[in-house]
From Swiss-Prot:
Located on the platform of the 30S subunit, it bridges several disparate RNA helices of the 16S rRNA. Forms part of the Shine-Dalgarno cleft in the 70S ribosome. The gene is rpsK. Belongs to the universal ribosomal protein uS11 family. One of its GO terms (biological process) is translation. This is Small ribosomal subunit protein uS11. One of its GO terms (molecular function) is rRNA binding. The lineage of its organism: Bacteria, Bacillati, Bacillota, Bacilli, Bacillales. It holds the Pfam family Ribosomal_S11. GO terms for cellular component: ribonucleoprotein complex; ribosome. SUPFAM superfamilies: Translational machinery components. Keywords: Ribonucleoprotein, Ribosomal protein, RNA-binding, rRNA-binding. Part of the 30S ribosomal subunit. Interacts with proteins S7 and S18. Binds to IF-3. It comes from the Bacteria. InterPro entries: Ribosomal_uS11, Ribosomal_uS11_bac-type, Ribosomal_uS11_CS, Ribosomal_uS11_sf.
Length: 129
């Protein structure tokens, strides 16, 4: 049985200078997504996607590495300045922002958009270890 020819799409270089870096920092992982101003994703990375497993995913170093890889691929599209939105209480919040700056992106604004309930759902019971 012959295999069909699969046409691979080449990633088109977009010329976008301003963008938004969404950092989702949970207690277990850190996900960094870099989008344009309209929310279309340019690049993304996470601690788990880089090969960190288990409790190593929730370290500030893993968040730093995820942020660096996402920013490098976004800078290939011509990204220069970025607004940062941070969501979640995890340990990788600050280190992910610092990694964006050290990678060469200019951070213009930092916004905390962590969802806070106005006494909505009942939280899960406390862990007893």
């Amino acid at each position: 049985m012959a295999r069909k020819q699969v046409s691979r799409k080449r990633r088109v270089k977009k010329n976008i200078e301003n963008g938004v870096a969404h950092i989702r920092s949970t207690f277990n992982n850190t996900i960094v997504t870099i989008t344009d101003e309209f929310g279309n994703a340019l690049s993304w990375s996470s601690a788990g996607a880089l090969g960190f497993k288990g409790s190593k995913k929730s370290t500030p170093f893993a968040a730093q590495m995820a942020s660096e890889t996402a920013s490098k691929t976004a800078m290939e599209h011509g990204l220069k300045t970025v607004e940062v939105t941070v969501k979640g209480p995890g340990p990788g919040r600050e280190s992910a922002i610092r990694a964006l700056q050290s990678a060469g992106l200019e951070v213009t604004a930092i916004r905390d958009v962590t969802p806070v309930p106005h006494n909505g759902c009942r939280p899960p019971k406390r862990r007893r270890v």
